Amino acid sequence: MLKTVLSKLLMVMYFVCGALILEAVTFHILGMGLMPEYFGYNFAIIMFLAILIFIIPNFTAQYIIYTIILGVQVIMIYVNYSLYMIYGDLFSIDMIRLLDEAGAAMTSNFIYFSVILQLVLVYIAIVVVGFMMLKKCKKDKIKIRQHYSIFNVILILAIQCFACTYYIDERLYINSLADVDSADYVSSDTFLMNTSFMKYGSYSKFGSYGYITNLLMGMNDKIDEEVQKATIDYFNSGEKYNYTDSEVFGIDSGNNVIVIMMESLEWFCFGDGNYDSGFNNLSYELTPNIYSLIYGEDYLTDPNNENLDNDSLVAKKFFAKSKTNYSEAYAILGNYPVGEGMTDIAGDSYDSSLNAFNYSMPGVLSSLGYNTSYVHSHVISFYDRNKTHSNLGFENVTGKDGVLDSQGNPVYTGDDLKWNHWDAEGDFARNAIDYIIPTDYDERPFYTFYLTVSSHGSYAYNENEADCMRYQNYVRWGEDDCIYNDVTGCWELKDKDASIEDLTPTEWYANVLKNYYDTYPSLCEELVYYQCGAMGLDEAIGVIVDKLKEYDIYDETTIVLFSDHYAYYDKLSNRVKGFDDEDYSSIELNTIPMIISSPGLKTFNSTQTDPEDVIYIENTRFCSAYDIIPTVFDLLGISFNQNLYLGHSLFTPLQYSYMENGEEVDMVVYYSNTGGLFCRNVYTYNMTDYIFNGIEEDQEVIDKFNAELKKVLIKMNYIQLLNDNHLYNQVTNK
């Protein structure tokens, strides 16, 4: 009897053993150890699947289905490994909806062939062993009556009951560890099970099958009346930001607002090639318009004038471990749905009459009479922006494919709209200037969010990248050896027959060659093309600033420039900044540009700084795109409910601070949708293990970090419930 039972269960054993072997591979490859902490939770789900398929009275059918599931598990191993290598992230359900975007952005640099080979070999070995077991099983043909005998049915039911009971018991136990409204909820395993806020920590606790099950369980966003009331009460109890007696609140009241998100921009784009000096070595020659926004035009004409006061703020600790769609949402909505996508909460199925996103920046400014526009120099359907952004509050949503000429004809068609066929960013800004600065600017104020694309990777030579073709000779050889061709719109060599030996490298190119040629020779050329994209962006900014001045509204416009993330394509930033490819805890690697040009800051600047020392406001608080909405609202004099936004105004005093090498710094926590939580000097992925950057390990810092971190996670959880259930209309404290 036992031999007969074991024979019939061979396919079950094949699947269970195969799943556990692949689980061990997953944990090893992601650096999580051997097996999940809640092994039984994960194993119960594996057993449930195994016995569910065992019901099929055909060994071959069982084998095929088991093999397919194991194949999916292998694919998931590779997906998680790739995401972890590129972003330090793991899979979530919303990524399935972005497969087209991911495919378009994919390059060979994101394909790990050695890992694919190893996984394929492991999979083949498992499948071959399974096939041998199948042959052994098929010696005894299954008779349906025998397969569904009383003994087999009892066996199936017993195993399934055990698996289900164990799974439910584990869920009940984990849920009992902390109540949703308790102070310890966000640091508990309950929180890890019920949310995907900390993917790495959740995966290491519950395993592959447990993690996916938790994600699927979390897709049910319906909440009971008690939780709904608690959510609304949380926002109604939120403290209003209304510092009317501060020095910045309302200094830009009524101003136009232009927010420009600069694709993959680094501070070293604005330098002279000596990248180790970072921000402190900015160069006017290559990016004059950004340089002018930072230092001011008066400085360019008379840098020794002791009475200079500029209107800019430079955030030198602006941080983003992020992706484009996340950073964009932070600056538009103040958050991003965790484990979901924008299409889930604001896509086709969203009822715009709910006004659920009226707290977004376009929503608030629209209510104040602003003309609100979103402009992108790539096609507007990318990331489904054509479906979501009008629901987020924008009156006008325009991509490259929607820009029309004066005759009403599309400016860009055909190949112009393909991925990596970037128009020169400056030319796009000229063609789209009436979308960026509305023609009714003199009738009502406007707010425009402009997302650029010219500095997007990959940074290999690309003849379809207009800025690459336009600037590459200028970047290498400068005006001495190059001349601008008005017909082609490109810088060309004066002597087209000149050899490299006859040309004089620019200071920038000479420094790049000196610093990187021996270590990363290919990086020198990648940096040339990356720099070309940055120069195209700078040209676009110049087009916008010139038009504002032409309309005589430059002094009535607040401009925010910020980068979405570091240049992770080709590991460019890792090479330049000197970080390992797998370094996901680094603060410096993820520190990128953010600049505010504000007419009101000129007056504020004169009272805050010594013009002989610095002519812009130097903000060294750890900050991010989460802080853009609160900061802009602060400058405009707009009161807001602080519980609705994850960030703070850069001018807001904060609750906690700590010492960083003798200097007191604010405790600000950043949640990364690509994995992990950070403050200026600490990183964690699970609130148990901490990596320190720049300071020695300090328990007091950990305690303050955890205290602020818990506040952030509690706020995120309530914002998630608010967005998923469209409850904003029921919040009275707005």
What would you call each of these model-derived segments?
Residues G201, Y209-D224, V397, Y471-N473, ...:
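Short, intrinsically disordered/low-complexity patches at protein termini
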Residues I64, L83, T213-D221, Q407-P410, ...:
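A broad, low-specificity signal for short, low-complexity segments enriched in glycine/proline
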Residues L215-S246:
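Short coil-to-helix leader/linker segments, especially the first N-terminal amphipathic alpha-helix
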Residues N236-K734:
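Solvent-exposed soluble domains appended to multi-pass membrane proteins
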Residues L22, I159, L192-T195, G201, ...:
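Alpha-helical protein-protein interaction elements
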Residues T4-A19, T26, Y211-E225, L282, ...:
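Short, charge-rich amphipathic segments
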Residues L2-Y211, K715, N725, K734:
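Transmembrane and membrane-interface helices of multi-pass
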